[in-house]
A protein has these predicted regions:
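A short, aliphatic-rich alpha-helical micro-motif
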Residues: 1-2
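Glycine/threonine-rich flexible loop motifs
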Residues: 14-25
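A short helix->loop->beta-strand "cap" motif at the edges of active sites that frequently abuts
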Residues: 34-38
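Glycine-rich, charge-decorated loop segments at or immediately adjacent to ligand/cofactor-binding or catalytic sites
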Residues: 40-62
Length: 160
């Protein structure tokens, strides 16, 4: 990172704790902080920003698919979450990231937001984004949630 002055983070999140883009943000923030660089987050609407739901992650269960003690559906934008990570001291050794968030214009979290582009090949539409917080809980079980089909996170079944 020696030849880098600033890192720009422009990735669409879906507002779910185990959607690993927020873990990637966390690791980027640590790398930027450790190298005394600046991070700019281009904030984006959260398609699940209109509600907060689910248990808060307990620290002894932290992993890449859950790094922060937040509810499953956290209601924050990626920029708000970056600010929270910084202010709560969740980065390694409680380091602080030189962070600037470019806010979203005219964003209202009470309005259900449809993403113009799919955030991931695994979340192809609004229905899959809406069902992801609940159906993803079955992902490490023998239950199928449509992975490898055109209806990922929209169907549930037993492959036997």
């Amino acid at each position: 990172m020696k030849d880098i002055d600033v890192v720009i983070f422009d990735i669409q999140d879906v507002g779910v704790r185990f959607y690993t883009y927020i873990s990637t943000l966390h690791l980027v923030m640590e790398a930027v902080a450790e190298n005394n660089k600046k991070l700019i987050i281009l904030d984006r609407p959260n398609p699940n920003g209109h509600y907060i739901d689910g248990p808060i992650l307990e620290n002894n269960f932290k992993s890449f698919v859950g790094m922060h003690p937040i509810p499953i559906v956290h209601g924050m934008t990626i920029g708000e979450l970056g600010i929270m990570i910084n202010k709560e001291g969740w980065l390694k050794n409680k380091i602080n990231c030189d962070l600037k968030v470019i806010p979203i214009e005219n964003y209202d979290r009470n309005i259900i937001y449809d993403l113009p582009e799919k955030p991931s090949p695994n979340l192809p539409n609004k229905k899959s984004i809406n069902l992801y917080p609940s159906l993803c809980l079955f992902e490490q079980t023998p239950i199928s949630i449509g992975r490898g089909t055109e209806m990922q996170f929209q169907i549930i079944g037993n492959p036997d």
